[in-house]
Regions:
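Non-globular, low-confidence helical/coil segments that flank catalytic cores
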Residues: 1-211
């Protein structure tokens, strides 16, 4: 977990192997961003355990960057135990009649800050069409890009102010993400890579050198 002040902004990156399950908390509200990993049941179990350790039995918000299994596969298991008041989905798929589908940039009040949600649909694969999420409070900024590719990152840099304290490194450290232009724009103090045993070479040395 990381956060300058626990009540203002806290991000917990759960250990789910080659996947991503993130818990964002601010001002007494909790949001799960993605719910996937090397095992659908393990990522759901670890998300439950984290919430229940804080006596939390529901979520204010559930968001997905995209629908690849390593970001989404634990969702059904998770929702059997803990409900979400609001669900936000990227407008790249109609897989779930579950919540609000976002097709344009929008801002959502959350805790003591604002969630800026930036959908993208210019990639060649669904994972490259990831929705980027920037959470900002007065004292903290967190940028999450899912598996967004370099073209999507450059679009973000061109269209938005992206300065953030924490960067969740895109696509588990793949060389096809985390371009120099993005790093120059964000200037993170801390970069976190959610990764586990894999056959893709993640995180690549190229990305580690850029960081």
């Amino acid at each position: 977990s990381y956060g300058p002040r626990a009540d203002d902004c806290r991000l917990t990156v759960l250990d789910v192997g080659e996947g991503q399950t993130l818990l964002l908390q601010s001002g007494g509200q909790s949001a799960l961003i993605d719910c996937g990993g090397y095992s659908d049941t393990v990522c759901a179990d670890r998300a439950w355990q984290m919430l229940r350790s804080q006596n939390l039995y529901d979520l204010d918000l559930l968001l997905f960057t995209h629908f690849d299994r390593d970001h989404f596969g634990g969702t059904e298991n998770f929702l059997t135990q803990i409900p979400a008041e609001r669900v936000i989905l990227p407008g790249i798929s109609e897989l779930l009649p579950l919540g609000q589908v976002v097709t344009e940039d929008c801002a959502v009040p959350f805790g003591k800050g604002i969630l800026h949600i930036y959908p993208y649909s210019g990639g060649n694969k669904e994972q490259e069409n990831s929705m980027a999420i920037l959470f900002e409070t007065e004292d903290c900024g967190i940028l999450i890009t899912g598996d967004l590719d370099v073209a999507g990152e450059r679009r973000l840099v061109k269209n938005h102010a992206l300065g953030a304290d924490i960067l969740v490194v895109g696509h588990h450290g793949s060389k096809y993400a985390t371009c120099p232009e993005l790093l120059d724009a964000v200037q993170p103090e801390l970069a976190v890579i959610s990764v586990g045993e894999n056959n893709y070479g993640h995180p690549t040395q190229e990305v580690l050198d850029r960081l």
